[in-house]
Amino acid sequence: MGHEYIGIHKGWLERFAGRIRYAEGNAEIAPGITLVPHSTAGLERIGEMAHLSVKENGKYRYDSFDHEQSLVFDASKGLFVMNSCSHGGADNIVKEIEATFPGKKIYAILGGFHLFRYKDEVVRAFAERLRELDVQKIYTGHCTGNRAFEIVHEVLGDRAEQMHAGMTVEL
């Protein structure tokens, strides 16, 4: 399998070193705003299914997404979770956030779900898991894919909205 680099532009970490603050574990960056790392074990199987790898010590392995984070806002309606591509699975991310903030309700999740390459039955099973987690609003777009969004919307109804330029979401 060929590999294509899709990470941070080479040289940027060094070029912008003075502007980057590395976070380990949960990091409250302002009152009510927390960065939460992804820690679900076994996500390499999703990396394999999505054909996403990382290079470590000159060798490739399937990505476990342990370097990805969620930005969580503790808002009046409940927790609002933001992600980019949710590579490790938005359903897994919701479970991680629930474990991180016990007793707090997750109101919404916003991000791409990286489902554009998956078969319909995989997307449907994902949407059903998300429904069981009882998140009230799902805002998705980007790498979710149009067909996958159709399936997610079919399962979740108006709880699922497709993101678009100029969209406003109130916390």
Task: Give, region by region, the residue ranges found by the protein language model.
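Metallo-beta-lactamase
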Residues: 1-69, 161-170
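Cap/insert and terminal regions of metallo-dependent hydrolase folds
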Residues: 62-70, 74-81, 85-165
